């Protein structure tokens, strides 16, 4: 039984009877006793129905979604929608079409539609092809549900590049912060590949063996860092051979969409494991088998062993060659080394050559090396004069020892600057680097100089001919006496000063001393004005009386 509705009371007088003004659009609610207005412009949240002009029932009002910017009204355009809603509707319709073509369930297509809605909200769709985004949303939904669909399936169906689709997928995972995306398990693709290869009634058995092979490869670290399609293809090929089905590499490649070389590489990696050495019966019966090292580890280990063997063989060959050398040949080989370094080199070659060495010889050599190191270290350490005196057995006053070692007449014995400059030649020695190997290699021979001159003459032939014509014409004019002054000589020289002629005349001559300096301040002002241009900012009338009218204005 529902509870009775609580009766509304006036907040001022507590009266329970109210009047609703139905004659205005506001619909105010007021108390009948005190006249207090309780509600102004009340909003009715219940659904109301009306009648259209044709008599059909219609709902009054409009629904506004959480992701909508405004309400949609059926006014001039029937069923008017926003551009965002149209994009979302078209995207979901295309997703369902792609899902139907690839036999993807409807619930996965609906999940892909929600992923597309999220991508649209974060503006991930802008600037990208719609097919790439739609296929990526479907692939993310398939990965979430752990289906057997691959990116290349969407690529072949939509006729787009698988690399472009993969790049869009990686960017979408980063933009939408998809962190809980599970890794693709190779066993998910095995059933799909088996169905395409048509194993008939033994399809279940082949799939079971292939799944067990995939788990074995995962235990042997072959699955890490590899494409799951390549692992699944190799497992299906091995399972087919285990059940006496002849399937070629080309058939597996056509189904799994991986390269034949990749497929063979997975088979070679499985061959090097402990499970690869078992028979078919033993492999099916064994359960707990020790896992092998990763293929990359074995590859690096083999490379390291190969390098170490090569180095050891090289050291052995060097020692054999050294043992066959005479003393003169050894001296030429170790001539650049000091005596101690040569002995160390011989000792190291002896040790690395695996020749039997007695313990006494080895200890003697080590003691000798340690003594040499100790003596060199002692000699290299700095000792004060007082310590040297104590080492010599004489105990003197330390201050006297320091005074003995103090330099005397240091400044007086230093060479003078003139003595040093006398040893420095003031002439430039152009041939000082003639004996340098780099300079000698840079110099050209006579044949190279002739070739270079011939090339330069050919490149500048027109210029040389023109200069020769000018020279011959000038000589002919001089012989005939048809010489005229240059146009530059006839030109009137431009005055350096821009003073008017009248002003220069009023200035008069400038009295100069023997060294060319003006004798008075007036002459200095005249010189300055005559050299500089006329300035509009100088009042020349007041400049006349500045020096008592001696300027000549």
UniProtKB/Swiss-Prot annotation:
Biased composition (Low complexity): 480-489
Sequence repeat residue numbers: 98-174, 193-272
Keyword field: Activator, Metal-binding, Nucleus, Repeat, Transcription, Transcription regulation, Zinc, Zinc-finger
Main localisation: nucleus
Cell compartments where the protein resides: Nucleus
Region of interest (Interaction with TBP and with the Pol III subunit C34), residue spans: 98-272
Role summary: General activator of RNA polymerase III transcription. Interacts with TBP. Binds to Pol III subunit C34 and to the TAU135 component of TFIIIC.
PANTHER family noted in UniProt: TRANSCRIPTION FACTOR IIIB 90 KDA SUBUNIT, TRANSCRIPTION INITIATION FACTOR IIB-RELATED
Record-stated family: Belongs to the TFIIB family.
Protein's name according to its UniProt entry: Transcription factor IIIB 70 kDa subunit
Source species of the chain: Candida albicans (strain SC5314 / ATCC MYA-2876)
């Amino acid at each position: 039984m529902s509870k009775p509705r609580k009766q509304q009371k006036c907040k001022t007088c507590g009266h329970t009877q109210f009047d609703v003004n139905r004659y205005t659009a506001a619909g105010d609610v007021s108390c009948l006793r005190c006249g207090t207005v309780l509600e102004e412009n009340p909003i009715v949240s219940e659904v109301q129905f009306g009648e259209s002009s044709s008599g059909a029932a219609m709902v009054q009002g409009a629904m506004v979604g959480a992701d909508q910017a405004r309400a949609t009204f059926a006014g001039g355009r029937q069923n008017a929608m926003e551009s965002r809603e149209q994009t979302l509707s078209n995207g979901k319709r295309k997703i369902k079409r792609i899902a139907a073509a690839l036999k993807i369930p409807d619930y996965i297509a609906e999940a892909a539609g929600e992923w597309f809605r999220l991508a649209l909200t974060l503006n991930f769709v802008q600037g990208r092809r719609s097919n790439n985004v739609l296929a990526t949303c479907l692939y993310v939904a398939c990965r979430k549900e752990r289906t057997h669909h691959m990116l290349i399936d969407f690529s072949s169906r939509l006729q787009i590049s698988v690399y472009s689709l993969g790049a869009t997928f990686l960017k979408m995972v980063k933009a939408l912060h998809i962190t809980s995306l599970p890794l693709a398990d190779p066993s998910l693709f095995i059933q799909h590949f088996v169905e395409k290869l048509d194993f008939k009634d033994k399809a279940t058995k082949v799939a079971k063996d292939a799944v067990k092979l995939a788990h074995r490869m995962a235990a042997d670290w072959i699955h890490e860092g590899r494409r799951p399609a390549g692992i699944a293809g190799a497992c299906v090929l091995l399972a087919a051979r285990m059940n006496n089905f002849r399937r070629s590499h080309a058939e597996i490649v056509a189904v799994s969409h991986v390269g034949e070389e990749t497929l063979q590489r997975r088979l070679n990696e499985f061959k090097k494991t402990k499970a690869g050495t078992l028979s078919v019966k033993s492999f099916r019966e064994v359960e707990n088998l020790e896992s092998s090292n990763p293929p990359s580890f074995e590859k690096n280990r083999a490379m390291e062993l190969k390098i170490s063997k090569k180095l050891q063989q090289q050291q052995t060959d060097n020692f054999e060659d050294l043992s066959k050398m005479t003393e003169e040949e050894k001296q030429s080989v170790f001539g650049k080394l000091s005596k101690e370094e040569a002995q160390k080199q011989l000792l190291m070659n002896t040790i690395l050559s695996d020749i039997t060495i007695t313990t006494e010889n080895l200890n003697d050599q080590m003691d000798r090396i340690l003594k040499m190191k100790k003596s060199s270290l002692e000699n290299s350490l700095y000792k004060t004069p007082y310590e040297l005196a104590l080492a010599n057995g004489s105990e003197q006053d330390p201050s006297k020892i320091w005074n003995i070692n103090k330099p005397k007449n240091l400044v007086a014995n230093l060479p003078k600057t003139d003595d040093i400059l006398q040893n420095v030649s003031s002439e430039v020695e152009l041939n000082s680097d003639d004996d340098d190997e780099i300079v000698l290699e840079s110099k050209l021979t006579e044949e190279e100089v002739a070739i270079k001159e011939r090339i330069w003459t050919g490149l500048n032939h027109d210029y040389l001919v023109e200069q020769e014509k000018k020279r011959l014409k000038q000589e002919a004019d001089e012989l005939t006496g048809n010489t005229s002054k240059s146009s530059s000589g006839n030109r009137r020289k431009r005055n350096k000063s821009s003073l008017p002629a009248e002003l220069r005349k009023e200035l008069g001559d400038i009295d100069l001393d023997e060294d060319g300096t003006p004798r008075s301040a007036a002459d200095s002002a005249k010189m300055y004005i005559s050299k500089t241009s006329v300035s509009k900012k100088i009042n020349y009338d007041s400049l006349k009386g500045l020096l008592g009218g001696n300027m000549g204005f």
